[in-house]
Amino acid sequence: MEKRFLSADSLVSDGFALAAAVLQSGWQPDHLVGLWRGGSPIAIALHEALAWKGLQTGHSPLAVHSYTGVDQRQTEIAITGLDALTAILPAGKRLLIVDDVLDRGHTLAAVMDALGGRYEVRTAVAWFKPERNETALRPDYHIHETSDWLVFPHELEGLALEEIRAHKPVPDGFL
């Protein structure tokens, strides 16, 4: 499997592109949820772009923990921040869930299950891996499809020293 190294700028561009797709669809979210960690930079850019175009939305993070290492998942997915979200967002509101990638789909499925139909939900991801998706979920909005191993700008785990030197802006003396 080929590794594709992504830049921070590409995630911002993808957030802007997702905002354009949401606006073009005519659907207007009341609230954005960025899935911590990977969905955060994309959700921030998406939120900024919607605001710049005049669409004001609330925003919150949800921390979703399922990976213990590269391509290794826990059997249970823990979600932090759900109580805070439901405390501020009344049932029936339009909620856009934003993540970096829909890979196997289990993270997004766990969030959808936890929300329990409380909201009108749509999903937006920068990257979709349809061949690896083990759920019936498909993102409502996505920019790219791939089967590549995606290496996000913040990721170091699972990389060889040579890959870090070639693709990561680490400071002198760090390695």
Pin down the residues of each PLM region:
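PRPP-associated nucleotide enzymes
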Residues: 1-175
